[in-house]
């Protein structure tokens, strides 16, 4: 069954890498590896890598130093806080990014204000509030929360918007956030080498605004430019702005509005990061618009491993790359996708699980 699946060939602290051995034997005969971000800094998601790095870069710039001169002990010191002063970092989030910004602000002695979209659960709200941030749930979608946070930052003395998406005139901090995400990609690449794999033949990565996807795709496209992996971007079908943009021959970005209702809360973003899109449209092989059932199925696959394969706790936004890969390998109705991706007995597949059970009640 591939109901709701749409795809298009594009014409335009160390976390774990886990080998899914029996799943590999059953499917591609070679290997499927999962980069598991459920342990990152005890925050259950990769997002903190971007926000914390961008905040560090901003502080370094303001005090006239290079970030390399500010190890964590210095960056979090009272001496540097006095030199930099008091700032308020604003952001919008579906959960993980805002939690990372709040976590970093607390450790840097700064303030954080977080705006969350309509439909946000109490668990996600509480996770951010516990970090000492001012947090609210608004009656608008994610993209409108971004605009709200940006407007508030502009009106606040020493207010800074730390958002993992870019728009005209706002590009430096999103670029830093994407660079921060690069930590995860470099780890995965190194861990694959430790497992005897020079580099993956296929990379499946999820996208909301496309910042993580841009970081992942950009890394592999640059590092292995002579023989890059087949890059596949997975979106929630309710917020598939990148897929819709790829369908346009012009390559212009298409926005998706409305409530963006999906179980993949972290991917419920209807307006793409312009920086990320420049990378993705030039290097991604396939964009896929994925229904909720695909994510739910993959979450169950991770939770019920075959044989001695590791048990992985993956949230709805984290599991969809495996869901798409599994569908391409197993479903007869998706054999054209498998052929387009050239998945075969020689494939070494990397899937990214970006989060653990960030909302276990749900």
State what each model feature region is:
Residues 1-362:
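PLP-dependent amino-acid enzyme catalytic core
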């Amino acid at each position: 069954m591939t109901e709701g699946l749409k795809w298009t060939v594009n014409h335009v602290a160390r976390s774990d890498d886990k080998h899914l051995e029996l799943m590999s034997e059953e499917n591609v005969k070679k290997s499927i590896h999962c980069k598991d971000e459920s342990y990152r800094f005890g925050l259950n998601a990769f997002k903190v890598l971007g926000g914390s790095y961008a905040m560090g870069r901003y502080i370094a710039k303001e005090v006239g130093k290079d970030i390399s001169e500010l190890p964590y002990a210095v960056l979090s010191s009272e001496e540097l806080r006095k030199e930099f002063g008091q700032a308020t970092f604003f952001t919008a989030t579906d959960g993980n990014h805002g939690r990372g910004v709040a976590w970093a602000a607390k450790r840097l002695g700064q303030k954080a204000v977080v705006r969350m979209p309509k439909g946000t659960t109490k668990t996600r709200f509480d996770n951010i509030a516990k970090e000492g941030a001012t947090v609210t749930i608004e009656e608008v979608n994610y993209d409108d929360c971004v605009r709200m946070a940006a407007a508030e930052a502009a009106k606040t003395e020493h207010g800074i918007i730390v958002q993992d998406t870019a728009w005209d005139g706002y590009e430096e901090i999103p670029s830093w956030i994407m660079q921060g995400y690069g930590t995860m990609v470099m780890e995965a690449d190194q861990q694959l080498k430790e497992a005897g794999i020079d580099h993956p033949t296929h990379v499946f990565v999820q996208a909301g605004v496309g910042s993580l996807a841009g970081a992942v795709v950009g890394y592999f496209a640059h590092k292995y430019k002579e023989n890059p992996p087949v890059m596949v971007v997975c979106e929630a079908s309710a917020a598939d702005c990148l897929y819709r943009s790829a369908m346009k021959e012009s390559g212009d970005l298409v926005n998706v509005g409305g409530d963006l209702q999906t179980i993949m809360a972290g991917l419920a973003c209807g307006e793409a990061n312009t920086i990320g899109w420049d990378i993705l449209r030039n290097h991604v092989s396939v964009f896929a618009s994925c229904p909720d059932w695909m994510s739910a199925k993959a979450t169950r696959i991770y939770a019920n491993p075959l044989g001695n394969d590791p048990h992985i706790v993956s949230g709805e936004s984290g599991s969809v790359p495996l869901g798409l890969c599994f569908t391409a390998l197993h479903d007869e109705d998706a054999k054209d996708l498998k052929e387009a991706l050239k998945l075969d007995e020689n494939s070494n597949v990397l899937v990214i699980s970006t989060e653990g059970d960030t909302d276990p009640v749900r």
